[in-house]
Amino acid sequence: MAVQQNKKTRSCRGMRRSHDALTTATVSVDKVSGETHLRHHVTADGFYRGRKVIAK
């Protein structure tokens, strides 16, 4: 079983965890349909950057 050699300080622990924060997903609004979607993704009704790319 692994056992640490020396105790890690609160500072070292915090610096290690500084990259673990979660960010919210960036959401955009389509120009034509006004629907919200993830950036660089097609909307649910098939629009991408104001153009119909998927016919339903």
UniProtKB/Swiss-Prot annotation:
InterPro entries documented for this protein: Ribosomal_bL32 (IPR002677), Ribosomal_bL32_bact (IPR044957), Ribosomal_zn-bd (IPR011332)
Gene Ontology cellular-component terms listed: large ribosomal subunit
Molecular function per GO: structural constituent of ribosome
Sorted UniProt keywords: Ribonucleoprotein, Ribosomal protein
UniProt keyword Ribosomal protein present: yes
Ribonucleoprotein is among the record's keywords: yes
GO terms classed as biological process: translation
Recorded family membership: Belongs to the bacterial ribosomal protein bL32 family.
Name of the molecule in the record: Large ribosomal subunit protein bL32
Species the sequence originates in: Edwardsiella ictaluri (strain 93-146)
